[in-house]
């Protein structure tokens, strides 16, 4: 019997990557940021996006990193997965993050970055018809996540808590 050696591909803030088994994919530093995994339920291919902000407001800044924003990163992730052989009808999503890291005394919606990131990711996924299978969002704790494209499990590690599998 041959053992399969897995490697972990790390995704930074405002970044995204695509993997195939035997690779795993991980991102850390998810406070108000949202980690979105889109995967093909029938193949062993997946992508992970680590978004920082909800909307790109394109046109205000030249040369903006599209992976930084939920509205543009999800589109890039979706299209890249299709280019790599994923089947649109088999795509599913899991997400984590979107915490409210600081107590705010203002009622301003602009400062609710975590919840706004989650809403923007959910809207972008809905636009592409990608169902969200599971999520671990909100609260006030940072997260690290790791996805296995073979088992389709997302390990979510919160600070000072046990790992949960979603």
UniProtKB/Swiss-Prot annotation:
Catalytic activity: L-glutaminyl-[protein] + H2O = L-glutamyl-[protein] + NH4(+)
GO biological process, one term: chemotaxis
EC number annotated for this UniProt entry: 3.5.1.44
Claim: rRNA-binding is one of the keywords in the record: no
Keywords: Chemotaxis, Hydrolase
Pfam families: CheD (PF03975)
CDD domains per record: CheD (cd16352)
Molecular function via GO: protein-glutamine glutaminase activity
Enzyme class: hydrolase
Family the entry assigns: Belongs to the CheD family.
Classification via PANTHER family: CHEMORECEPTOR GLUTAMINE DEAMIDASE CHED-RELATED (PTHR35147:SF1)
Function per UniProt: Probably deamidates glutamine residues to glutamate on methyl-accepting chemotaxis receptors (MCPs), playing an important role in chemotaxis.
HAMAP family assigned: CheD
Protein name: Probable chemoreceptor glutamine deamidase CheD
Species name: Oceanobacillus iheyensis (strain DSM 14371 / CIP 107618 / JCM 11309 / KCTC 3954 / HTE831)
Gene encoding the protein: cheD
